[in-house]
Amino acid sequence: SVPVIAVGRINDPELAEKILQEGKADLVSMGRALIADPQLPLKTIEGRLEEIRKCVACDYGCISRLFAGLRITCNINPDVGKEKEYKITRGEKVKNVIVAGGGLAGMESARVAALRGHNVTLYEKTGELGGQFVLATKPPHKEELQNVLDYLRVQMDKLGIRIELGREVSAKLVEEHKPDAVIVATGAVPLVPNIPSIEDKRVVTAWDVLAGAASVK
């Protein structure tokens, strides 16, 4: 018989195993999944499935750039293509670091700082981590983006990063704690044009709709 290799959107080792166990293929090939997390096979062997950074098939950094003749990147793995430059090493001195903002940039910054051996406290002014990326998971068929948030939240816990929800970083807070470094990752706000009737109650932003604060019928 001819060996069959299954390929395409297989980003979960449990799905890969299911394909093999059910006899649907002899081998499973992963491409983008290993760009997003090169350690996926090792984490699977060690039973650390919750630590896998799963590809979300955005294709923005890999396939789209490859077809354009550009160096590939990855939206959820900033190391791709710059592994040498971004090599994470232990700092010479342990520092106290404050991260302002609990979105993707804030959590990734906190993760790297902790891996370098620093004491990290992350402040998020809302009641949950994720920032505006939480809204990105709300539209239909975008639920898989939740994998990115799940991965980073697991990392926050695994690395012992102190999380302060419902607290905003201020000059007073920084003065009180006197950290060695402050990382500002407070995100962006919608650019609302200054045009007539913009304050009308019928005018809403995408942020409001996705957050459930406004409805469009």
Q: Where in the sequence are the language-model features?
A:
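FAD-binding core/adjacent interface of flavoenzyme oxidoreductases
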Residues: 58-62, 66, 90, 162-217
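Flavin-dependent oxidoreductase catalytic cores
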Residues: 1-100, 104-120, 128, 190-191, ...
